[in-house]
């Protein structure tokens, strides 16, 4: 008498559909040289947890994976979130590294922005500690659409409308966002399959639906109206962000080329006032933005930049003006002997 044997339960990696695996694999293949170490920033929520599952499924040979978790104590359930991340790491056979941070008040930032800054600083610290140069982030199409709407409502410029980039660098760490073209519904479907398979459940962040926070207000109040009137609007807005990114890159290329004609000197700290005045008003502004960014100066508001532009236009033809001392974020712009300088 023969007996049947039950098929083994699929692993978490087997549960991950191709639609979620492929973008991660493509992002990793594009890295040159290929990384030996990789990390996923995991909060304990569904998005980042499922990105960890996808990364484990497509991890290249010779590459090790870690999960980075930032515990900032803003929520009463923060300890539970950390425990959930450790549980996920155990299921995937991946080490979990945790950084505890405190979000200080009074930095001139809202709580959302302050927490985000603390999170990036903590991730950079973990990356240095473990020799990791590439961190995967789980931002998806819905996040991208919300970001575009928020920046539009805040009056952002062309670069801001490009929203989140698939690859960006900050504090010496490369951040990859392979899911910017993935709808969150696919991620939640995988989270449901993982829960059914092994019982692991993603945590719920109450601030995600608290309309006191700007992003949550867009998500809970504006997005449902757009869903009802324009189904699929997130994909349209995400496409707009890609187009804005291309346009911003073209503008940046023109600004770099223009600045090279301004006789830059002293590692780009100074340029010719007369040559700058030969540019159109729009290109003058872009050249100034490029210059300030190249000197690691925070970008001024549009009004502040316009004031600098006005003062430079009105200087004596030879550029001798001891009264020009345009101060911004601890830096000083001055003009001497026909050249514009920036000092610490």
Swiss-Prot record:
Q: Record's superkingdom?
A: Bacteria
Share an example GO biological-process annotation for this protein: tRNA modification
Q: Name the Pfam families for this protein.
A: ATP_bind_3 (PF01171), TilS (PF09179)
Sample GO molecular function, one term: tRNA(Ile)-lysidine synthase activity
InterPro entries per UniProt: Rossmann-like_a/b/a_fold, TilS/TtcA_N, tRNA_Ile_lys_synt, tRNA_Ile_lys_synt_N, tRNA_Ile_lys_synt_subst-bd
Could you say which residues bind ATP here?
A: 43-48
Which compartment or compartments is the protein found in?
Answer: Cytoplasm
Q: Does the keyword Cytoplasm apply?
A: yes
Q: Which GO terms describe its cellular component?
A: cytoplasm
The UniProt keyword set, sorted, is:
ATP-binding, Cytoplasm, Ligase, Nucleotide-binding, tRNA processing
UniProt cross-references to HAMAP family, sorted A to Z: tRNA_Ile_lys_synt
Which family, according to the similarity comment?
A: Belongs to the tRNA(Ile)-lysidine synthase family.
Q: What function does the entry list?
A: Ligates lysine onto the cytidine present at position 34 of the AUA codon-specific tRNA(Ile) that contains the anticodon CAU, in an ATP-dependent manner. Cytidine is converted to lysidine, thus changing the amino acid specificity of the tRNA from methionine to isoleucine.
Q: What is this protein called?
A: tRNA(Ile)-lysidine synthase
Source organism per UniProt: Bordetella parapertussis (strain 12822 / ATCC BAA-587 / NCTC 13253)
């Amino acid at each position: 008498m023969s007996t049947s044997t039950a098929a083994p339960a699929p692993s978490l990696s087997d549960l991950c559909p191709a639609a979620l695996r492929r973008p991660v694999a493509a992002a990793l293949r594009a890295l040159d040289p290929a990384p030996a170490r990789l990390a996923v920033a995991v909060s304990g929520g569904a998005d980042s947890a499922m990105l960890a599952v996808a990364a484990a499924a497509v991890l290249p040979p010779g590459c090790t994976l870690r999960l980075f978790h930032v515990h900032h104590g803003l929520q009463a359930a923060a300890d539970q979130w950390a425990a959930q991340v450790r549980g996920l790491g155990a299921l995937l056979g991946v080490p979990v590294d945790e950084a505890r941070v405190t979000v200080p008040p009074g930095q001139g930032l809202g709580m959302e922005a302050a927490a985000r800054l603390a999170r990036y600083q903590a991730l950079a610290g973990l990356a240095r500690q473990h020799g990791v140069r590439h961190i995967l982030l789980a931002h998806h199409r819905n996040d991208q659409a919300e970001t575009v709407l928020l920046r539009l409502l805040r009056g952002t410029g062309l670069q801001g409308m490009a929203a989140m980039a698939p690859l960006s660098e900050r504090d010496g760490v490369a951040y990859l966002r392979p899911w910017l073209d993935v709808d969150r519904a696919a991620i939640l479907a995988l989270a449901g399959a993982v829960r059914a398979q092994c019982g692991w459940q993603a945590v719920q962040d109450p601030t995600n639906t608290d309309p006191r926070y700007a992003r949550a207000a867009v998500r809970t109040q504006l997005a449902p109206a757009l869903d009802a009137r324009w189904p699929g609007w997130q994909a349209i807005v995400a496409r707009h962000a890609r187009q804005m990114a291309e346009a911003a890159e073209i503008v940046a290329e023109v600004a770099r080329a223009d600045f090279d004609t301004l006789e830059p000197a002293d590692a780009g700290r100074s340029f010719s006032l007369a040559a700058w005045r030969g540019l159109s008003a729009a290109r003058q502004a872009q050249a100034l933005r490029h210059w300030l960014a190249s000197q690691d100066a925070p970008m001024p508001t549009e009004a502040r930049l316009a004031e600098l532009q006005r003062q430079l236009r009105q200087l004596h033809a030879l550029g001798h003006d001891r009264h020009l001392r345009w101060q911004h974020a601890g830096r000083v712009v001055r003009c001497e002997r026909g050249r514009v300088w920036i000092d610490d």
